[in-house]
Amino acid sequence: MEDIGLLPSQIEFLAEDTTITVVPNFKMESLIFLSGEYGPFVPSFPIEIPLWLAISLKKKKKCTITPPDWMTYNKLKAKFQEENKIKDGFIELPENFDEISSLLLANCPDDIKDINKIRILKGDILSRREKKLEESLKSHLNSLTDGESVTTMEFKNFSMMEINKIRASYVSGINDLNKIQNSDNDNNNNNNNNNSNNNNNNNNSQQSQSASNASSRSLFSKK
């Protein structure tokens, strides 16, 4: 099966178009890019710009970045508790949760309150979801009847990055399982064909023996 998914770096690149609030410490007219016009920039006045531009300005020490509302200790703790309560599904996370939080943790740690707690909570949330996914896959495979092929599974509230992380191993495992099932079916068909041939040979042998016995009886009767 051809792999048509995106690389993690490509998914992260797309997430960098998400708008985020920054507080500039410089004055400048609007910046014009192919993707749009951003500005003007006035010191101490918050402005929304793409994440990629915010990170670039942050690296130049031209602004502070305001993390999204959901990126606080209390809100992430609530998300983690909610994720644990749901056994058979997944909670809805903010769009590009993994990518945005990773980029902010790496590029503006001084702008994030309780950064160590947030980093741990983020990892706990994603690990819990990964564990639940693994359990769901095992449950699905165990529920299949003999000879039933594995095609697709539907997961709600799953991000592109999470799907990307499990896609390759999942598709590979499904292909291997289908090969095993097809091999078993071929073996069963071959066994059935062999049994059928053996039955035909036995029937032919019995018919020949019956004909021979009938001929002998006919000759004996004539004598």
Swiss-Prot record:
It comes from the Eukaryota. Its main location: nucleus. One of its GO terms (biological process) is double-strand break repair via break-induced replication. This is Probable DNA replication complex GINS protein PSF2. Keywords: DNA replication, Nucleus. Residues 179-223 are annotated as: Disordered. Component of the GINS complex which is a heterotetramer of gins1, gins2, gins3 and gins4. GO terms for molecular function: 3'-5' DNA helicase activity. Coiled coil: none annotated. One of its GO terms (cellular component) is GINS complex. InterPro entries: GINS_A, GINS_bundle-like_dom_sf, GINS_Psf2, PSF2_N. The GINS complex plays an essential role in the initiation of DNA replication. The keyword rRNA processing does not apply. Residues 181-216 have a biased composition (Low complexity). It holds the Pfam family Sld5. Belongs to the GINS2/PSF2 family. It is found in: Nucleus.
